[in-house]
């Protein structure tokens, strides 16, 4: 790991941590908040499932627009300034959710979820910053460092949210608000990143769709983005339904589900900190690393649809998350390498918007559980990941530098 990069970009890495930490923090809270009547009678036994679905759906809807917009904005204003906007916006979102509990007003909670989604743009901006800060041959290692930080946040968020929420639902929301506000101040005082505007930015509500439309003029970015979308859709379908399987088929309690999620986080950590570097050295090319990761991850996902028992599912979950890192890091690196330096925020914004869309689709699929067993969706997740190999095969090799 590049310790100097962590030191010089400490505020940025904290922003990445808080983005994923606060995201994971909300899952146990939402389940608890909408488990029964609440919010002064606005949530009832009759509408609680609808309210819970809305609480989950608003974040990815906001993220779909916010990640693309903030990613493009970062190419115009610079990474640091846009990260300040993200953190201040996240603080405002968690402030609204905290206020909703104080006033027993569920629509304030929904507004906070939407604001948090709109401001959840630190990951693509951080990824673009890492690419700017290192040489092309070190790009994958820099992405892996961002993934390590994401993994720590992914493990800490649900655990801390569940513990604090057990005593008072307002505690984790207040913690998220305070940490995001503190990081916004840190970023405002930081000195990394661009200090001048690089190109004009014009606000347009159609911007996320226009950002996708720009792909037609940048064909090199299409293959890695298509592979990334299929890969993420398959994995997030698995992630959504494996929790249902562990609870309904294996009798896991809420605490055990939390520990299961932490185990998945350990897999991400192992993949990022220990496994990615030797695999990268072995396969060398981003395209080959991505294909290896998708083939391994997809095959393991297919096994989860079989009756392997609770212990088998735990082992498979760790291995799946290790393999996930190979494709995740290499595909992000391939996307950033497909455009020039001024458009890396744009392409990373597209990747995060794609993830938001995948989260939304995977969530909608849960409505089919009454008609189909969860194992069907686990198998479908594996098939989707394997389908991602098709576009990955068409990823272009990096262009050789022009000799003077």
Where would I find each of the regions flagged by the language model?
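C-terminal ends and interior cores of transmembrane alpha-helices
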Residues: 88-103, 296-308
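A late C-terminal transmembrane helix in Major Facilitator Superfamily
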Residues: 343-371
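Helix-to-loop junctions at the C-terminal end of transmembrane segments
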Residues: 65-78, 271-285
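Short amphipathic helix-loop junctions that connect adjacent transmembrane helices
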Residues: 28-49, 240-256
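Juxtamembrane intracellular "pre-TM" segments in multi-pass secondary transporters
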Residues: 1-6, 192-226
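C-terminal transmembrane helical hairpin of 12-TM major facilitator-type secondary transporters
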Residues: 287-331
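Hydrophobic core of transmembrane alpha-helices in multi-pass small-molecule transporters
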Residues: 17, 93, 105-121, 312-326
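Cytoplasmic helix-loop-helix junction between adjacent transmembrane helices
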Residues: 112-150
């Amino acid at each position: 790991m590049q310790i100097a990069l962590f030191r010089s970009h400490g505020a940025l890495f904290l922003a990445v941590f808080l983005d994923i930490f606060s995201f994971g923090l909300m899952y146990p809270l939402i389940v608890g908040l909408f488990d029964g009547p609440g919010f002064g009678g606005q949530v009832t036994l009759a509408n609680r499932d609808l309210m819970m679905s809305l609480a989950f759906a608003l974040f990815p809807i906001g993220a779909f627009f916010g990640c693309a917009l903030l990613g493009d904005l970062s190419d115009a204003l610079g990474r640091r300034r846009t990260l300040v906007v993200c953190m201040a916006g996240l603080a405002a979102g968690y402030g609204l959710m905290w206020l909703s509990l104080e006033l027993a007003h569920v629509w304030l909670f929904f507004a906070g979820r939407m604001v948090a989604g709109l401001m959840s743009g630190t990951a693509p901006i951080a990824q673009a910053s890492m690419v700017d800060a290192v040489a092309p041959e070190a790009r994958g290692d820099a992405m892996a460092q961002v993934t390590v930080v994401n993994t720590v946040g992914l493990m800490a968020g649900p655990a801390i949210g569940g513990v604090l929420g057990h005593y008072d639902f307002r505690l984790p929301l207040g913690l998220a608000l305070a940490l995001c506000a503190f990081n916004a101040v840190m970023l405002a005082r930081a000195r990394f990143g661009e200090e001048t505007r690089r190109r004009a930015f014009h606000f347009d509500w159609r911007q996320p769709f226009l950002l996708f439309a720009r792909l037609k003029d940048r064909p090199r970015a299409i293959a890695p983005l298509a592979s990334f979308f299929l890969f993420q859709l398959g994995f997030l379908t698995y992630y959504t339904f494996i929790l249902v399987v562990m609870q309904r088929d294996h009798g896991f309690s809420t605490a055990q589900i939390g520990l299961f999620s932490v185990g998945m986080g350990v897999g991400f950590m192992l993949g990022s900190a220990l496994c990615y570097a030797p695999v990268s050295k072995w396969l060398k090319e981003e395209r080959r690393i991505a294909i290896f990761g998708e083939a391994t991850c997809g095959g393991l996902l297919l096994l989860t649809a079989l009756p392997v028992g609770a212990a088998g599912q735990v082992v498979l979950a760790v291995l799946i998350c290790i393999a996930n890192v190979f494709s995740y890091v290499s595909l992000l690196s391939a996307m950033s390498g497909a455009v020039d330096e001024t458009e890396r925020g744009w392409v990373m914004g597209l990747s995060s918007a794609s993830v938001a869309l995948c989260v939304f689709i995977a969530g909608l699929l849960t409505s089919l559980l009454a008609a189909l067993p969860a194992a069907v969706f686990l198998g479908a997740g594996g098939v989707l990941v394997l389908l991602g190999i098709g576009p990955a095969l068409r990823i272009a090799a990096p262009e050789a530098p022009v000799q003077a």
